[in-house]
Amino acid sequence: MAGFEFYGEGPPGVDLEELTGKLIVLEGTDGVGRSTQIALLKPWLENHGHAVLVTGMTRSALAGDGIKRAKEGHTLSGSTMSLFYATDFADRLENEMIPALRAGFVVLTDRYIYTLMARSIVRGADPDWIRKVYAFALRPHVVYYLRTQIEHLIPRVLHSTGFDFWESGADLRLGETMYDSFVEYQTRLLKQFDAMTEPFNFEVIGASKSIEQVFEDLQTRITSHLE
């Protein structure tokens, strides 16, 4: 992709020709290692002369804290949470990503609209509706889909944060235990990500490899996109 374009109608007043930076997305299920790789990529890119902005879900000034409080209460419906996340994304797009891209930054984002769409669909949202919700999003230059099997995710999650209520799909009552619910929920998310791979041009990276091997793979691929 030479320049930027929106999936549908973008925010008003944005001149795409002014966006000279690069938008790079790391996607994948919970516990796959996205945040670890972004923490490695940021200083690597900076050492190679690139200004870098890192962003991710629930980090907007407008909606980030509200989403975290809503998740603690477990009371909002799936569609309401979907729109809450869309608000967070829209705020970050307008006030973080677009200004950084206009200034020539490399924007590294830990998940993008694909996670938000996948989660919404798994929770019963109509796929066409949720895609229209995010039609204002910029098409990234590249999306790296870190993919691994469920059996590799479980030990990673257990050794980091443990089973989270939302990341285990506990609100959907998919299993008798948090473990069973996590396995079923993440399996459904994997199915959605796999279905998005071709239409959204994901580059699939096997995330079952070591952190160093995945990082080297990303370095090689990103270098080719920045040349």
Model-assigned labels for residue ranges:
Residues L23-L26, V106, V143:
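Hydrophobic "anchor" residues on beta-strands that sit immediately upstream
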Residues A2-E17, K42, L158-E227:
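NTP-dependent small-molecule kinase module
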Residues L16-P43:
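Walker A (P-loop) phosphate-binding motif
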Residues L116-R188:
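A glycine- and Lys/Arg-enriched "phosphate-lid" helix/loop adjacent to the NTP-binding pocket
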